[in-house]
Amino acid sequence: EIRLSLVGSEMCIRDRYCQTLDLRDSPELIAEYRKRHSQAEAWPEILAGIREVGILEMEIYILGTRLFMIVETPVDFDWDTAMTRLNTLPRQQEWEEYMSIFQQAAPGMSSAEKWKPMERMFHLYNT
């Protein structure tokens, strides 16, 4: 999805990616997963890597065990290339392996393999 955003005082055209992933059905694991994604606990190398591959903004929402992630990128962003590169950056594989404890995903899977793209089925824009 391409959208226009105001960044500072400039208008920017961006792509938006929406993805989903399920967590294991364990209140303790979910609480720990939330903690690990807090500003105080997130690994700096992971945040730096996300920015380094060109991701402008990322948000993750949760409902029960279901995660919903919104990623905004420049319009010339190539998802597959960026995710391949991200997987080679410092501590990324270690982070993914650690996160697999909480996620309904097999150990050794990359972020791109775990998070499933969602299809937009409705939109309403102001005209």
Regions found by a protein language model. Give the residues of each.
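An amphipathic, aromatic/His-enriched active-site/gating alpha helix that lines ligand/cofactor pockets
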Residues: V53, P74-K114
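Eukaryote-biased recognition of C-terminal alpha-helical segments
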Residues: K114-F122
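Short, well-ordered beta-strand segments in beta-rich or mixed alpha/beta enzyme
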Residues: Y17-D22, L56-L89
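Short amphipathic alpha-helical segments
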Residues: L29-G54
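Single conserved hydrophobic/aromatic residue that forms the stacking wall/gate
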Residues: E1-G8, I13
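Short, conserved, surface-exposed binding loops centered on an aromatic residue
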Residues: E10, E52, E59-Y61
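Short glycine-/aliphatic-rich beta-strand segments at the starts of folded cytosolic domains
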Residues: R14-E32
